UniProtKB/Swiss-Prot annotation:
It comes from the Eukaryota. This is Importin subunit alpha-6. It comes from Homo sapiens. Consists of an N-terminal hydrophilic region, a hydrophobic central region composed of 10 repeats, and a short hydrophilic C-terminus. The N-terminal hydrophilic region contains the importin beta binding domain (IBB domain), which is sufficient for binding importin beta and essential for nuclear protein import. Forms a complex with importin subunit beta-1. (Microbial infection) Interacts with ebolavirus protein VP24. Functions in nuclear protein import as an adapter protein for nuclear receptor KPNB1. Binds specifically and directly to substrates containing either a simple or bipartite NLS motif. Docking of the importin/substrate complex to the nuclear pore complex (NPC) is mediated by KPNB1 through binding to nucleoporin FxFG repeats and the complex is subsequently translocated through the pore by an energy requiring, Ran-dependent mechanism. GO terms for cellular component: cytosol; NLS-dependent protein nuclear import complex; nucleoplasm; nucleus. Gene3D superfamilies: Importin-alpha, importin-beta-binding domain, Leucine-rich Repeat Variant. SUPFAM superfamilies: ARM repeat. Belongs to the importin alpha family. InterPro entries: ARM-like (IPR011989), ARM-type_fold (IPR016024), Arm_3 (IPR032413), Armadillo (IPR000225), Importin-a_IBB (IPR002652), Importin-a_IBB_sf (IPR036975), Importin_alpha (IPR024931). Keywords: Cytoplasm, Host-virus interaction, Protein transport, Repeat, Transport.
Amino acid sequence: MDAMASPGKDNYRMKSYKNKALNPQEMRRRREEEGIQLRKQKREEQLFKRRNVYLPRNDESMLESPIQDPDISSTVPIPEEEVVTTDMVQMIFSNNADQQLTATQKFRKLLSKEPNPPIDQVIQKPGVVQRFVKFLERNENCTLQFEAAWALTNIASGTFLHTKVVIETGAVPIFIKLLNSEHEDVQEQAVWALGNIAGDNAECRDFVLNCEILPPLLELLTNSNRLTTTRNAVWALSNLCRGKNPPPNFSKVSPCLNVLSRLLFSSDPDVLADVCWALSYLSDGPNDKIQAVIDSGVCRRLVELLMHNDYKVVSPALRAVGNIVTGDDIQTQVILNCSALPCLLHLLSSPKESIRKEACWTVSNITAGNRAQIQAVIDANIFPVLIEILQKAEFRTRKEAAWAITNATSGGTPEQIRYLVALGCIKPLCDLLTVMDSKIVQVALNGLENILRLGEQESKQNGIGINPYCALIEEAYGLDKIEFLQSHENQEIYQKAFDLIEHYFGVEEDDPSIVPQVDENQQQFIFQQQEAPMDGFQL
């Protein structure tokens, strides 16, 4: 877990929260790679590589019309005779400019073929890729430059080995020079190629950054009035900011924050989406990176974009907001001061499960904050929705809701914890004790322990000697489940279960040799028939 909180927050939690079993660093949780599906999926919202596909047209010169939008794909068939021929290779090595252009266009059309362009055939022809790179330097022939750049773009849209060929032929520094070309088509194709190269992996990304791409790229973004160029340039910039293993050198990419903050007010959803992705990557890290993002002045606009009508904008905006609230309490408060909670409440009812899940994750990092921040979540009427999610949602979303509620029981006041109990949080927490995810079983046990601890304090203060929350847990079949957890394979879980029973329930397990069976399909423990409640232990 790469969670990170400020030292002040850690100390405060250790002193103020009695729940020593819940690691204070874990309360503020960085996004877990295995837990968030959006980045793993090939999502529509963002592609790390894009091929400029070929659409047959009558005009020979591509400079007569804007470059095709990167999100448009084509399945237009290419005539079978268009394969790499000896004539094409001879023409590309000709000294005749017209033949060079004709051959390059033929190669470009082949490389634009969907869905499987013959990249390997092209790069295996000796000297052809190097010839394309040579054509990039033909400033007197912008049409040839453009066609060569397009061909190289599509080679770089392939595998790492394909991208590596483009890098090793020395194309990257030349593409960066072409960002200052007088011809917009050439500029746009150059930035597209650089985006594909940077999008391959961290090694390629860092190579492009070390070639000093950022100053001319930011100048292009500042000066261009062409929407397709802006789209491609922002997408390339987001690829330069992307990656965690390792992340890009922050000093290399942080100068883009001012430009991103301006582009965050674009009216184009594609531009907005990639700006938000870039900000989400930049804020995914330690608190000093989060602070740099905050200082760029983007928070209020990011929160506004949570209510955008296009999910491809909402998803990365939510990711960025969620990353910012993994910071310390002061950084979290910046987001709260932008009226984020009503937006998060809205997103908790989104028809998209992935949005609901990330909204729960974001709220869980807010409830890991101070008591005033927990109260703000209460005042926003978010907890009733969280408890409903805890009861009914998909398991991956329930997990995030469990963190949100347990974090609130860990740092909340007695009144705040009583509020959660009154909303009915005990039953769904008890239901989580039977799932196969050991971490979530621990989270649920910690939440119940915090509630029981409060009940013990209240019973002593009131002189009644009875913990009012023990009965609620028993009614929810929680005691039965805690007893069975004494046979859990995880040492921390069975020790916690033993301690809870010994301290709060004053009973011993009848037969410590009983080990529940596991139903792999249901991902939960199955208890003996006579011990199970009437409605079973369903997720």
